């Protein structure tokens, strides 16, 4: 979205051609691949880093890993979000109450502490260990509605170049 469709297609082709292996596995598998020297760099969600720190078997994999945040000289790193919506629900009012609870300060503190994710409620801070890792990083402020408008284009490009193949 920041550079245009032509740039994105060229970038994705170069990324695919530079992969150490066909895309596979989950976030933990990507870190394990670095540890096993299958690749030098992988993409994953930051909160898995913290989950792995608390697992003695996986903690050793982190000896070869350092979280980095790309695009720091420009628009910053993309941040995933967790979303929630109500669709065809007979209990609409209770659903709204549940969403309001999930967004509350108390629930967001639980979420941030349990998962090491960024809370959406501005009254709640991320955990100190998350803040220490992301210290100084900038994050992409692109409106998610705008970002979502590129989904079809992105999917078409990924299919066109057979990214997963």
Predicted segments, located by residue:
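Extracellular/periplasmic bilobal clamshell ligand-binding domains
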Residues: 126-165
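Soluble non-cytosolic domains of exported or imported proteins
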Residues: 6, 25-28, 43, 89-93, ...
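Short beta-strand->loop
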Residues: 59-78, 87-89
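Ligand-binding pocket segment of bilobal, Venus flytrap-like solute-binding proteins
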Residues: 1-68
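Mature extracytoplasmic/periplasmic domains
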Residues: 82-141
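Non-transmembrane alpha-helical segments in soluble domains
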Residues: 12, 31, 35, 43, ...
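Residues that form or immediately flank small-molecule/cofactor binding pockets and catalytic motifs
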Residues: 29, 70-73, 116
